Amino acid sequence: MASLSRALRVAAAHPRQSPTRGMGPCNLSSAAGPTAEKSVPYQRTLKEGQGTSVVAQGPSRPLPSTANVVVIGGGSLGCQTLYHLAKLGMSGAVLLERERLTSGTTWHTAGLLWQLRPSDVEVELLAHTRRVVSRELEEETGLHTGWIQNGGLFIASNRQRLDEYKRLMSLGKAYGVESHVLSPAETKTLYPLMNVDDLYGTLYVPHDGTMDPAGTCTTLARAASARGAQVIENCPVTGIRVWTDDFGVRRVAGVETQHGSIQTPCVVNCAGVWASAVGRMAGVKVPLVAMHHAYVVTERIEGIQNMPNVRDHDASVYLRLQGDALSVGGYEANPIFWEEVSDKFAFGLFDLDWEVFTQHIEGAINRVPVLEKTGIKSTVCGPESFTPDHKPLMGEAPELRGFFLGCGFNSAGMMLGGGCGQELAHWIIHGRPEKDMHGYDIRRFHHSLTDHPRWIRERSHESYAKNYSVVFPHDEPLAGRNMRRDPLHEELLGQGCVFQERHGWERPGWFHPRGPAPVLEYDYYGAYGSRAHEDYAYRRLLADEYTFAFPPHHDTIKKECLACRGAAAVFDMSYFGKFYLVGLDARKAADWLFSADVSRPPGSTVYTCMLNHRGGTESDLTVSRLAPSHQASPLAPAFEGDGYYLAMGGAVAQHNWSHITTVLQDQKSQCQLIDSSEDLGMISIQGPASRAILQEVLDADLSNEAFPFSTHKLLRAAGHLVRAMRLSFVGELGWELHIPKASCVPVYRAVMAAGAKHGLINAGYRAIDSLSIEKGYRHWHADLRPDDSPLEAGLAFTCKLKSPVPFLGREALEQQRAAGLRRRLVCFTMEDKVPMFGLEAIWRNGQVVGHVRRADFGFAIDKTIAYGYIHDPSGGPVSLDFVKSGDYALERMGVTYGAQAHLKSPFDPNNKRVKGIY
């Protein structure tokens, strides 16, 4: 028997080889040293699995010839998806597992469930998983899933970590999740074996717990089978059949296996680390990597029984209660990649690399000192799949209709499985999930990145290594940068631009007055023999963001904002998505796609939403009507019929493209969608002086009469043809210039030269965030999401409900309007100058009625501004009188601050400034 202290000595005496080198699977009898004994809960299954593969014995039951949906993979996600499909009434659902249920990754997972995460959607998903495993499955089947409610304890060794936990506690109040911030002394009383000398405090969540993966998956399979679903084990999938319809759309046709084929229109890829291989069978890109992920199980520890599970984030270690012992694991900076994923791997394990694992042992011994003299009963090192942003991959693949993803769960497949299985089932049956799943949707990644090996590897490494880091609101990745750069990148970098990354693009964040801060090649934080960058200016500036207070450059952002309000600012918005929708059916398609009336004369520009069939908002964007053109140019493609120019936030361009494409396919529209995002740049000149500046650059009259708001024209700027639009995302007089790529730099320089005497300065997206919330403009996927309707969000003016023209989502909006709104988006301001970022609880008359979706500081009104949806605790409609009559407060990190509710933006509520009235 090895002890944890001996393991530390072994690791020190035997340095390991390159961390990137893949290691082959081992069976129970082949391990040496501390890994000789692996008495994990599935030892019998493992030993049985070392003989002849069960696959050779044939499938566990005959294959049906047809199915309505085939789920590939019998792990947590596969079983949860099958169960929820059956529960929602889907007939003909089949699950294919190449070995036995839980093989591959699920069988060796720790099975932890924490109820609080820094995401409102994830809190909801976790709550559903907990309901399923702790109550619903047992009620349905009479079987125990192995759920144990022993509570969870998050450890804070510094002030910022404790602040993060207080944020989680405030969010939990909006969802009824009980949690308590404990002092070190209170923590010691709860967990007597814990060292609390270095603690600032802890967050205790009494209803957290653990799940048994084998028990849960077996029970899910039985419950699904009772509802008519089929589970077929020992049946590897060897291919995906695809057909192309009359409109050139690729669709799923069937599944091939070693034992026959199944005709089906729908496949769900829940294959874990093998998901990329399954994707390749269908020509679908699945951006994930496989890594070794490990934990050790200790011998018996006196006094550990009934203790809560522990996450010591600052030590990057977790301690899971396992009877009268502990499982110890975590996330390291130098994880081992599994370079060549074997399709023979089922219930095997890797040898544990003690040098890699040492840091977790050190952290565990520091937190629970008795572990230093405690023996190691077993080690478990198996494969897990990880993704570029540490979020799962879900939804319909943009390359293939009927091919859904449910993979890449970053070692959280058990805890997220119930919620995600339910949402995936809705996605398959109804075309969309019920919740806002954009953060998990495969369409959140641009298609140019999802098969880019360096980007996938770098980002997956960084997200793994930072998994236990504090989640700060304005953090940025260092990995996978400079993938997409617009024509102004070098120009702005030289002027001190500090860039953010969105959708692969480098976009301006803010401008540092002390010179360039370029993003350098990823250094893996010094792991794998890489040399960490020294004197890295960008990393230093990013470190200033690691706070829940105002950052040091708060005043720099203030300067950018007030320059825009008082004179003028230029924003490089080239990362925007820019599409053309043209063709004979383009007007019919536009009427159906867009909630607003966009059938205005050429030269008009309309702000609109795109909705789903439930009336939820899939996008907000501008749509500009084009005049027919017989000669193509970057600013106007040649087309017959009708044409529209679409511009939307670049971070969601792929989502928009996929949504529009799917709707056009479903409607069988005869029109063309053209992506010109890479061909055009875009700068926005905003502020009271913008007209005077641009009048020197553009060859046209810019008066209100000659160039009204919400119109566009093809003009020349410093001799270059551009599309000028009179629009504003910040609530000021201003114009956007959409510019062919080759003309961006000369046009930008001409604007800056003309603006020098007017006080024109560069500004970035941190300023846009502040200016736009101050004006009351919405940001998609912040205060406007696929589960929010325009009526709830105060955007009824974007919906052509007074016209007879049908549009996608109209029926749902009409039903919602007739029934009364059950929640509304409300603007709040506070006199206390404290930063808020979202997730803060909203109190009304002493009751929690929601949480903040988005918040920032408004420099013109000199107040913190927050937006959040509120509901009536009694369950009734939320009227305007309900909003106005309440006494409000916002809870930030456990402290409440009085707040004033507004029905309109407190800044320029009559919209005079965008009209040029100052």
UniProtKB/Swiss-Prot annotation:
Gene Ontology, cellular component aspect: cytoplasm; mitochondrial matrix; mitochondrion
Tele-8alpha-FAD histidine PTM positions: H108
Catalytic reaction equation(s): (6S)-5,6,7,8-tetrahydrofolyl-(gamma-L-Glu)(n) + sarcosine + oxidized [electron-transfer flavoprotein] + H(+) = (6R)-5,10-methylenetetrahydrofolyl-(gamma-L-Glu)(n) + reduced [electron-transfer flavoprotein] + glycine
N6-acetyllysine modification, residue list: K173, K559, K775, K802, K884, K904
Enzyme Commission number, as recorded: 1.5.8.3
Interval spanned by the transit peptide: 1-22
InterPro entries: FAD-dep_OxRdtase, FAD/NAD-bd_sf, FAO_M, GCST_C, GCV_T_N, GcvT/YgfZ/DmdA, GcvT/YgfZ_C, TrmE/GcvT_dom1
Subcellular location: Mitochondrion matrix
Cofactor note: Binds 1 FAD covalently per monomer.
GO biological process: sarcosine catabolic process
Region Disordered, annotated ranges: 1-40
Family annotation (Pfam families): DAO, FAO_M, GCV_T, GCV_T_C
Molecular function, one GO term: sarcosine dehydrogenase activity
N6-succinyllysine modification, residue list: K38, K173, K377, K391, K802, K884, K904
Tissue spec: Expressed in pancreas, liver and kidney.
Cofactor names: FAD
Keywords for this protein: Acetylation, Disease variant, FAD, Flavoprotein, Mitochondrion, Oxidoreductase, Phosphoprotein, Transit peptide
Ranges of Low complexity composition bias in the record: 1-13
Main location: mitochondrion
Function: Catalyzes the last step of the oxidative degradation of choline to glycine. Converts sarcosine into glycine.
Disease: Sarcosinemia: A metabolic disorder characterized by an increased concentration of sarcosine in plasma and an increased excretion of sarcosine in urine. Sarcosinemia is most probably a benign condition without significant clinical problems. Some reports have associated sarcosinemia with intellectual disability and neurologic problems.
Name the record gives this protein: Sarcosine dehydrogenase, mitochondrial
Gene for this chain: SARDH
